[in-house]
Each structure stands twice: as C-alpha cells, then as structure tokens.
Amino acid sequence: MMTTTDLFLLNATNVAQTQLSGLEPWLNALQRQQWQQIKQPRRRQEFLVSRAVLNRLLTSHLGQDPQNLHFYTGPHGKPALTGPGQEHCHFNLSHSGDWLVIAIGDQGPLGVDLELGRRARSPLPLAQRFFAAAEYQYLADLPQAEQNSAFYRLWSRKEAVLKAHGGGIAAGLDKVEFVPQQKWCLLNHLDGVDYRVHDWPWQGGWLSLAGRTSDVHLHQLDECLEIMTGQPHLDKNP
C-alpha cells in the first residue's frame, strides 16, 4: 500500500476532443446510464470526464482491470470501493468552476474540497449562520478586502473534513472548527478524529484535503489527460 495521498487537478472543460471520444468505455454500467440521462452539455462533459478519469486513476493505483472496480454509496452519499483487494483504497473528488480534483490514497478516509467562488456580497452573514462563533469573529476582524478569501479557505477546510468523515455538510459546518491564529489548528467536535488538513491557494480560490497522512503529492493533468511534469503552479499563499 502507498503511504502518500495523491491529488490530481484537471480543467474538465479543456480536455481534447480526441480524448473525450475515448472516455465512455471507462464508465461502468451505472455511470454510463447516469451520463446518458444528463441533457445539459457542460454538465454532461463534466460527469464523463470526472468518472472516466477517476476510474482510470483507480485502475492504475490498484493495478486492476477497470471492470473489476466495485463502488458503493454510503448512507450520506459518499462513494467508496468495496471489491476484493480494493477496501484499503480511499478516494474523493470535488468540482468548482471548470476544475476537477481527485484524491486517492491508502491511509484511511479522505475528503477533498475545491472552492473557486467569489461572492459579490459580504461573506459575514453566511459565516455567522454556519461557522463557529470564534471563526465568525476572526473573519469579522479582518480587513474587508481579505474576508472573501479567508471565508472560502475556512469553508474548504471544513468541507474537506466533513467529506472525510462521510457525513458531508449535513453533519454540521459548525462541528468542525479551525483556529487560524494557532496555525489553523483543528477542533473536531464531530468525531474526534485527528485529521491532518492541508490547503493550497488555487486559481484564486482554495483547495483543501483532509485525511490521515502528511505526505501529499500534487499532480496536474493536461488536455490529453497526461500528468504534467513538475508541480502544479499554485497561487501565492496570502
């Protein structure tokens, strides 16, 4: 088993047409049925790319044939693998804007979240409603120009933990609290697990990963779905 977690970043709208035409065979029967039911072209391409690339990456990671991948969906909607020799492999994916991110690793449940949104209005009312009181106060004390980025950084970190837990946002954003003034220390009121949370500025937003490992490798796929050499060009961390 691998002791690292790999993150794969891809612009799902920038995949070459020659690659798109060859992705359908990578879908399993259920995925193909779901894909065929999608009418909106952008959403249809996004679904095809995300599921086909996920299956390709899992096949490579496990060293198994794609038809042997067996998925199930947890009680709160989180997908996982259940086939022979696959239970140790954990994965998670997230979309935002044009971008897709897939996390794969063997060291326990993973949660990944990508937030590229920009709010025209102040994020403080949302933070007051969904965040812990101390987090709201942290945002309120920041200069107005910094509040938007800090809000999405908090949201991304929180959602990554909630996805690793498996309950998603319904489990409660306020149950996962961060203390930015203490190196973004996690106060986990949800399940007590000591998740290791990493984040990176990406495309003007934030990418966060929650899991059990501190060794994370980032990769970017090009329009031909090949891994690009070198590290992805991350934004400067504010």
Regions found by a protein language model. Give the residues of each.
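Core catalytic alpha/beta fold that binds nucleotide/phospho-ligands
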Residues: 1-238
